[in-house]
């Protein structure tokens, strides 16, 4: 179970690479949008599946 848990969560850098943006963009989205980010301790973590669904929903476009 620990292996599956670890595989599901990615950090800011991996999220940026996954979405093709910079780490600064991810941090701005955390502040300004409803990006599915989870704060675990001092770190922001993401699930790839939640990020993909967020992008597909069109919510990643900042108006």
Predicted regions mapped to residue ranges:
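Short, electropositive, low-hydrophobicity segments enriched in small/polar residues
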Residues: 15, 45, 62
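A short, Lys/Arg-enriched interface patch at domain edges and termini
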Residues: 49-63
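Extended rod-forming repeat segments used as scaffolds/tethers
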Residues: 14, 31, 41, 57-59
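Polyanion-binding surface elements
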Residues: 1-28
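Major-groove DNA-recognition helix of helix-turn-helix-type DNA-binding domains
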Residues: 19-45
């Amino acid at each position: 179970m620990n292996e599956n848990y670890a595989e599901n969560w990615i950090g800011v850098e991996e999220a940026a690479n996954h979405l093709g943006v910079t780490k600064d963009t991810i941090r701005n989205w955390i502040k300004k949008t409803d990006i599915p980010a989870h704060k675990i301790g001092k770190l922001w973590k993401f699930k790839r599946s939640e990020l993909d669904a967020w992008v597909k929903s069109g919510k990643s476009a900042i108006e």
